[in-house]
Regions:
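Conserved active-site segment immediately N-terminal to the catalytic lysine
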Residues: 113-125
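Conserved PLP-binding catalytic core of the aspartate aminotransferase-like
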Residues: 219-251
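Conserved beta-loop-alpha segment that forms the PLP phosphate-binding cup at the N-terminus of a helix
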Residues: 1-16, 20-28
């Protein structure tokens, strides 16, 4: 995230940041650390940004040089429509679109060139199924022109120098060799399944998880445009979301996550990206029902599991 700011903007440049969660908020914080003037579109947590709001902001101030957004906002479980945003930003030759696809790439289709996504970043630790430690970035010709003029200092995250080295089959600094070897296997697995089938599977798993939780009497936090990378579930009244995710781990060996900031105790989050299958979803829904029952919440055991099974059996 830092490199996608320091390599393309200079102190005093203007950026438009979509703040609809913890990681959207982070865009603004990093921009300010590099002396970039930030305009934020604050989106209620659980909502996706309205593309019209972005279009209106750029129309009001065409001097904005970059728009920063998450394709998948991990803190809320919302997916922003980066395809629509790309169409908008294409109309501004002096503005680039930068997309955080850390929990999106490998989950659903992202057409960087066709959609006009100038800079797209991701990491090894999400749908690419590897340990953390390696980041990836794609850069359009339009964005490279910005990099030639940027005046923010960057030593380790210098994309221009990295590009020069990679043209010689080298890296700027010591590479994460073990992760690169692991990435070979990841790509082999993805290629064997086929991207279209992989995206369809991820979508089916996400749909089954959401509908299974609803059938168990729980509400899904995103109001619209839920991400297929994870499901963010609202805790029932009187039940602490932190207790739910902790009991999932302690009692049933399922690693989930709690809410962040104002969502702490109010939601819990379950991932189904990467190497996940139908029975991972069924197990997660079943364990959630059992945890809720154990915490004294009224839930009909098997109600959510049955719904998830119906969806997962569909062709």
């Amino acid at each position: 995230m830092e490199g996608s700011i320091s390599n393309f903007l200079s102190p005093g440049d203007k950026a438009l940041c979509i703040n609809g969660g913890k990681f959207g908020e982070r865009w603004g914080k990093i921009c300010k650390a590099f002396g970039v003037q930030v305009t934020e579109i604050k989106v209620e947590w659980g909502d996706a940004v309205d593309p019209k709001a972005v279009a209106d902001a750029l129309k009001a101030d065409p001097s904005i040089k970059a728009v920063y957004v998450q394709a998948s906002e991990t803190s809320t479980g919302v997916s922003h429509d980066v395809k629509a945003l790309g169409e908008i930003v294409k109309g501004y030759e002096n503005t680039i679109l930068v997309v955080d696809a850390i929990t999106a790439l490998g989950v659903f289709d992202i057409k960087t060139d066709a959609w006009g996504l100038d800079v797209v970043i991701t990491g090894s630790q999400k749908a690419l199924m590897l340990p953390p430690g390696m980041a990836f970035v794609s850069v359009s010709d339009k964005a490279w022109a910005f990099a030639e003029k940027a005046k923010n200092a960057s030593f380790y995250f210098n994309f221009k120098k990295e590009r020069e080295n990679q043209a010689k089959n080298q890296t700027l600094f010591t590479p994460t060799v073990s992760l690169i070897i692991g990435l070979q296997e990841v790509f082999r697995i993805m290629k064997a399944e086929g991207l279209d089938k992989m995206f369809a599977r991820q979508g089916q798993l996400a749909h089954a998880m959401r509908e299974g939780m609803k059938a168990a009497g729980l509400a899904i936090f995103p109001k619209n445009s839920p991400s297929d990378a994870l499901t963010t579930v609202c805790s029932p009244d009187g039940v602490d979301g932190q207790a739910i995710y902790k009991n999932l781990r302690v009692q049933y060996g399922i690693t989930a996550a709690g809410g962040q900031d104002q969502l702490k105790g109010k939601v819990f989050r379950l991932s189904h990206m990467g190497y996940a299958d139908r029975f991972d979803v069924i197990t997660a829904v079943a364990a959630t029902e059992m945890v809720l029952k154990g915490l004294g919440h009224s839930v009909k055991l098997g109600s959510g599991v049955g719904k998830a099974q119906e969806i997962l059996m569909a062709k």
